[in-house]
Amino acid sequence: MPDMLVNLLKLPGDETLTDALRKENILIRRALTPDYYRVLPRITQLMGENAAGEANACFSRIPVSLFLATQGAKVVGFACYNATAPDFFGPTAVDPAYRGKGIGKALLIRALRAMREEGYVYAIIGGAGPVGFYESAVGALPIPDSEPGIY
C-alpha cells in the first residue's frame, strides 16, 4: 500500500455531508481527554491494538489529534493524525454497520482541515489502503517509491 500526498490548500467542503449526518444524529467532533477510556477499547474493536496505540498518542497532544463520529454515546468511527509521525493522517475506521453514509469522508476532511489549521500545507496518508477513495475524496496522489513505508 503506497503512501499518498494531499494538498491541504485544496480540500473540498464538508458542510453538506456533515449536515446529512446530523439528520441521522451522527456528529463529527474532536475527541476530548475525558473520552480516553471509552474510545480506546472501541478503536481496538474497530481496528486492533496497533490502531489503539496510535490513538493513545493522539490523546497526549493538545488539542487531541483524533476526531470521532458518534451517534449518541456510541463511537461509530474515528480518524487520527500526527499519531505515528508528524504530518501523517491515520489510522481511521468506520464501524461496518455505518459504512456508506459518508462518515469516513467527513472524518478525513475534518482531520485534514485541522492539520491545515495547525500550519501544514501537505499531508501524508500512510500506507493508504483504499487508494481510490482517497483520490476521489480529497485528490490524494500516490507517492512513488513509498513502499515499504513507515508501517
Q: What residue ranges belong to the model's regions?
A:
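Conserved hydrophobic beta-strand within the GNAT/NAT acetyltransferase core sheet
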Residues: 89, 123-127
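A conserved beta-strand-loop-helix scaffold within acyl/acetyltransferase catalytic domains
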Residues: 44-96
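A short beta-loop-alpha structural element at the N-terminal edge
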Residues: 27-39
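Conserved acetyl-CoA-binding loop-helix of GNAT-fold acetyltransferases
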Residues: 94, 100-113, 117, 136
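Conserved active-site alpha-helix within GNAT-family acetyltransferase domains
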Residues: 1, 105, 117, 128-151
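Acyl-donor-binding surface of acyltransferase catalytic domains
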Residues: 1-23, 127, 148-150
